[in-house]
């Protein structure tokens, strides 16, 4: 097997993670989970990855033990999926799902190290892109698997039994991934062969585009440890410019808005609109495909135009599209036309997310002083994950009262974030114009 053979094993695990990202919330709804607790489920999942990334990243950095850490993380993910499939107790499902995303976060910084093996530093950003590609296709494959499996088996087996059987299949996929990884992962390097963490962080910071894993589960933890390992909060805070401070305030606000929308959404689609599990998977897949198809195009636009301006456009679109999902449900409930319109809305949500995600790294890099650019990118990852988790819990609470209220608040928060980014955009443009030399 060539040096990238282990990536096939990780792609297989990504299939299980992609399917599980929606399957577990749908299973939670099917066993009677309420709206607020669904928000807690999503919030715990969003927050669980960061501790895993920091713990496993530090161990891998200090000891060089990569193989055992990857296998341990895959083992924890397998255990988590089995635990969820064997219980109908909401708190146990929340705990199992938290363990799943702890494991997913834990393996991410270790894979970042593995993908650089045998290559020179200048090629590392391209290697990170290879890892993201395998992971992204696996994630999308998991959504396709969920769509097909639940559409075919929910009728004969019943909704809960079909979902449990898919959880078992996902657990088996991660278990097989661990077996293949044990065969194909490269050996742990000697101390002399280990790349310095500062070089890894520098290469990650050069990767100007953040990975777009999914419009529905946007935060990846692969960067978090490497970009924050040398973080000194006081030093970084002292170097924050007013524009960067405002931008991070915007990030908090619009990621809370994203969480408010996605947190209670599975329950709204399945219970309020009466969509079958396969149809919900289809909508999420459409959103992820929209992101994937627009990723390169958004990157090309960001190289020609202001990333801040493009991000404002993406945020304004999301601000309108979040309440649009509830409006479609009110105006065209449980109709073929309503379903088709929702499909278009979800595709546009994915496109808008691609624009936001691709431009984020460029905006942070432009606003941060050179000395703290890596740390600023790490803070972006950490803040976005935490804000998304808080938003998910808030969305679950609001959705318990009214989904139109929840999605309206989500849109309003994203709109406020867009206004703050527009302030940064205008301020940056003014500085750029005023700093241009006068012509003779």
Predicted regions span which residues?
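Central cavity-lining transmembrane alpha-helices of secondary-active solute carriers
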Residues: 40-58, 282-297
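Glycine-rich segments within core transmembrane alpha-helices of 12-TM secondary carriers
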Residues: 129-150, 383-391
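Helix-loop boundary and gating motifs at the non-cytosolic
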Residues: 1-47, 243-283
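Hydrophobic core of transmembrane alpha-helices in multi-pass small-molecule transporters
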Residues: 11, 91-107, 252, 337-355
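Structural signature of the two symmetry-related core transmembrane helices
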Residues: 68-83, 309-325
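Helix-to-loop junctions at the C-terminal end of transmembrane segments
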Residues: 52-65, 294-307, 399
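C-terminal membrane-cytosol helix-exit motif in multi-pass small-molecule transporters
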Residues: 146, 150, 171-194, 205-219, ...
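Cytoplasmic helix-loop-helix junction between adjacent transmembrane helices
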Residues: 96-137
């Amino acid at each position: 097997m060539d040096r990238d053979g282990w990536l096939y094993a990780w792609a297989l695990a990504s299939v299980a993670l992609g399917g599980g990202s929606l399957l577990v919330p749908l299973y939670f709804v099917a066993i009677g989970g309420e709206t607020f607790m669904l928000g807690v489920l999503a919030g715990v999942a969003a927050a669980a990855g960061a501790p895993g990334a920091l713990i496993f990243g530090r161990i891998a950095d200090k000891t060089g033990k990569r193989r055992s850490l990857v296998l341990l993380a895959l083992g924890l993910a397998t255990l988590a999926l089995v635990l969820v499939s064997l219980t109908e107790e909401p708190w146990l499902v929340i705990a199992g799902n938290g363990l799943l995303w702890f494991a997913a976060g834990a393996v991410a910084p270790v894979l970042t190290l593995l993908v650089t093996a045998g290559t020179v530093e200048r090629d590392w950003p391209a290697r990170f892109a290879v890892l993201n590609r395998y992971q992204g296709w696996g994630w999308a494959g998991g959504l396709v698997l969920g769509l097909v499996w639940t559409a075919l088996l929910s009728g004969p087996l019943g909704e809960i039994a079909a979902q449990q059987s898919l959880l078992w299949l996902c657990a088996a996929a991660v278990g097989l991934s661990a077996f293949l990884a044990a065969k194909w992962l490269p050996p742990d390097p000697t101390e002399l062969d280990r790349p310095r963490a500062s070089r890894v962080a520098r290469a990650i910071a050069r990767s100007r585009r953040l990975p777009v894993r999914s419009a529905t589960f946007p935060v990846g933890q692969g960067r978090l440890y490497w970009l924050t390992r040398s973080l000194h909060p006081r030093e970084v805070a002292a170097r924050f410019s007013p524009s960067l401070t405002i931008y991070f305030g915007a990030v908090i606000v619009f990621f809370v808005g994203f969480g408010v929308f996605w947190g209670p959404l599975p329950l709204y689609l399945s219970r309020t609109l009466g969509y079958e599990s396969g149809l919900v998977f289809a909508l999420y897949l459409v959103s992820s495909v929209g992101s994937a198809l627009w990723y390169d195009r958004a990157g090309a636009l960001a190289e020609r135009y202001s990333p801040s301006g493009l991000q404002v456009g993406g945020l304004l679109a999301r601000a309108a599209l979040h309440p649009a999902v509830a409006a479609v449900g009110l105006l065209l409930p449980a109709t073929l036309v309503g379903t088709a319109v929702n499909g278009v809305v979800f595709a546009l949500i994915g496109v808008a997310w691609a624009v936001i995600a691709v431009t984020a790294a460029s905006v942070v890099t432009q606003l941060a002083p050179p000395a703290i650019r890596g740390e600023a990118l790490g803070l972006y990852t950490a803040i976005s994950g935490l804000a998304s988790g808080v938003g998910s819990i808030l969305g679950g609470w609001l959705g318990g009262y009214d989904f139109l209220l929840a999605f309206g608040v989500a849109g309003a928060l994203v709109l406020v974030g867009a206004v703050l980014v527009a302030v940064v955009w205008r301020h940056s443009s003014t500085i750029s114009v005023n700093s241009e030399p006068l012509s003779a």
